Amino acid sequence: MKAAVRSVKNFSKGYTDTQIKVRNATTNDSWGPSGTAMAEIAELTYDQNEMLEVMDIIDRRLNDKGKNWRHVFKSLSLLEYCLHNGSENVVRWAKDNIYIITTLREFVYVDDNGHDQGQNVRTKAKEITSLLEDEHALKEARGDSRERDRDRDRTRSSRFDDDDDDRAPYEESRLSRAPSRASRYDDDDRDHRSRRRSRSRRPGRSRSRRRSRRPSPSAEHNSAEENDPELQRVIEESKRQAEEDAKRRNMANDSEAELQKAIQLSKEEDEARQRHQREREQQEQAFMGNQQNAYQPVDFFGNPVQPQPTGFLQQQPTGFIRPQNTGFVQPQYTGFVQPQHTGFVQPQATGFMQPQRTGFVQPQATGFVQPQATGFVQPQATGFMQPQRTGFVQPQATGFMQPQRTGFVQPQATGFMQPQRTGFVQPQATGFIQPQRTGFVQPQQNGFFNPQPTGYMQPQRTGMMQPQRTGFSQPFESNNPFPVMQPQRTGFGQTPNAPMMAPNHTGYVHPQPTGLQRQTTGYTGNNNPYSRPLQSQSTGILQQQQQQSAPRLEPTKTGSNNPFAQFSNLPSQSTAPATKPMKPVRTGDDRFSNIAQAISTGNPMGTDSFGNIGLTRVPTQHTGSKFTNSAGQTIQAQATGNTHNPFQSQQATGYYKQPMQQQQNMQQPYYNQQNYNYQNQQPMQGMQQQSMQPQVGSLIDL
């Protein structure tokens, strides 16, 4: 039944005779393949086409399922036989597909009875793997198989020859006796020979030719190589690989040539770019050289002038920038003007005020900054340097701000002088005004200060301070450089009509009717040019009074020469005691009569015990009074009546606290007949003076 099914399947699948023989040798029957069938298949392997058909069926059987373990085992047995007796192509195929055989060493199958049927398969796979891995054992096995085949063929041929010799006489007698029987034996022998001949002829070669080829191994190897498709495929693959390598080398050579060509082109481009850059630089240098030659500054004799090392950016008429001569823009190619061609003023030729020639107060020359020249810088001794107590040491060198323009500082609200009104602080000698160095602002035609060799401003023609704009007055014959500020009732709507003073009167304003209303001023006779307290003021709309005239020069009890007393702490009090004239102090020593006379008269130019005059006299921290020659009572600071004054603060350090009294107007005219003859009139807006309580003291007594 199985044979019939197999025959139908062979026919339906279209298997060839060689494939059918291999399938019959590897059936699933319980018996193994016969030796004759395996020998015939081994003979077929010498033909290349039939060898491929044999190996194809063996490969399928080796990869069959586990239940068909007999297919696998019989295929391994047939392969082992072909390795011993087949062609060399079988050996090469087995080595190329050794992984299939190696995998079968792990073959496992257990049947329904619990028997491991894969044991035989694993054993056979291990034997074939060992044979393929051992080349020497494989050669010996194949050699032994050839010897056995030769012996078998020799034995068979000799047997056939002996049979023929023994049969000849018998055949002759027999043929003579029974011709029919002899012809029958001949027919049988011919059939037998024809079968053998056909069997040997099917592989495509005769046994005789195989025998003649076997003794020569080299010839057999050569013929096997010629008929081996794998070898041919390998050879073809090698040729193809060689061709690919040659092409790759050619491509590499081509790419190398292209790379060299690209490198050469890059070099040429780089050289061309550098050449163009050099040409452009040469052209620029030539153009710049022409420009430089065209605009090269020269002196009076035609020699080229080098640019001055100034902090200004140099400029030439060219708009090209040369970055190599400056850290920023090159001078000869910048768009900036060089110092010799620029409109900028050179520092040595500028019209601006030089520091050594300016009319401003030099810090090193002033008596207020240097403590060793004056004693007024110490804050504990004077309140002079404090902002709330000054009001008169303002930038005296200005004079740009005109009093008529500032209407925001009310006289009753502040006791400070406007900065444009000052100009009386002499820096080089004392903190007070030196008559021979006027220090007043000259009324020039322009609004600038001309630097004079003296360093002070000349008061000839100033157009800054207009006299008709001030509401303050000064007697014509008064030599007081600081005019008294008259308290007044301000009557708005009044038209000022004050003429301008002559240049020899230092630009100060004569008492003229102004739009501001004034009250009668009482003078205290104080010699201090700064301490001029104001009387209480009252404002009235559209009222006018005549100004009070010239003060008297007489010593009083309040004859203190301290210029800082009126700037001490101001409480809000309104009582003012009447001032009394002060009698001269008698020291009983005629040796110091001049000092006593100077102290008693309140002369600020009197000398002290050390020979100092004016502001250089010893201040109050070294004596009992404000100055060593300031005899009499000191002036008590009075309240201004305005508690919102931002400059009112505590009393300056170095002074003892004194009780505050009523605010009063003080005026101290001063006139020196021996050395100076000048008249000063200075309008002061909002200056409120304060008086201190009298304190009797004398340098001689101390």
Swiss-Prot record:
Residues 136-285, 504-589, 683-702 are annotated as: Disordered. It comes from the Eukaryota. One of its GO terms (cellular component) is plasma membrane. The keyword Phosphoprotein applies. Disulfide bonds: none annotated. PANTHER family: EPSIN-1-RELATED, EPSIN/ENT-RELATED. This is Epsin-1.
